[in-house]
Design a protein with these regions (language model features):
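Glycine-rich phosphate/diphosphate-binding loop of Rossmann-like nucleotide-binding domains
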Residues: 1-14
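Gly/Ser/Thr-rich loops at beta-strand to alpha-helix junctions
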Residues: 53-58, 99
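Short, acidic/turn-prone active-site loops that include or flank metal/cofactor-
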Residues: 20-21, 74-80, 96-99
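Short Gly/Thr/Asp-enriched flexible loops that form oxyanion-binding sites at enzyme active sites
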Residues: 58-71, 75-79
């Protein structure tokens, strides 16, 4: 559902599904997927990621632990719209364990639709747009200064976890070698 609605509403974007699949030989934790997301964002392989976990909170926290990643928790259409307009981050996390029966699926679709309804970073409310845009820029500057370089970060992690995330990245995006990514 996540891929279907992202593809439907992110009309001007190339949408790639690199999620976890039932037929994969390897299982990935949300922490490992967050590391993969950090690699994809920091290597400019993707500009934006829509992801999640059971609660959405764990993935949001894991993603925000990655240098260069600004992830918002967007359980509702209003949250998605406000994150896109005010915070202008590069990842959103949804609570995928919510009851995606008819009403849950409807909420998921409305959330994705609201996320991509306008270009990101326009500010909200519009009367406060200039201030909101400046605040989002300051937040990104503070985050960048408070974290280490992504390559240094990778070198401090468990090499097996990094290797596992790189393996998924290479397979998902048909990358040739490590020269294309950290």
């Amino acid at each position: 559902m996540l891929y279907k609605y992202t593809k439907k509403y992110a009309k001007d974007a190339e949408v790639i599904n690199f999620g976890c699949f039932v037929d994969e030989d390897e299982n990935y934790t949300y922490v490992e997927i967050a590391l993969l997301i950090g690699m994809l964002i920091n290597n400019h392989i993707v500009d934006f990621v829509v992801t999640g976990c059971s609660s959405g909170q764990g993935m949001m926290l894991a993603c925000n632990s990655m240098p260069g990643v600004l992830c918002g928790y967007v359980p509702t259409a209003k949250d998605a719209y406000l994150f896109a307009q005010i915070n202008n981050g590069n990842v959103v996390s949804l609570p995928l364990g919510e009851e995606y029966t008819y009403t849950g699926e409807k909420n998921l679709e409305e959330t994705i639709q609201a996320l991509f309804s306008e270009p990101f970073g326009g500010g909200y409310p519009k009367s406060e747009a200039k201030r909101k845009i400046a605040d989002a820029k300051k937040l990104k500057e503070i985050k960048a200064k408070s974290q280490i370089d992504f390559e240094m970060f990778l070198n401090k992690l468990d090499p097996d976890m990094v290797k596992k995330a790189k393996y998924k990245m290479h397979n998902s995006f048909n990358l040739i070698d490590d020269k294309q990514c950290n």
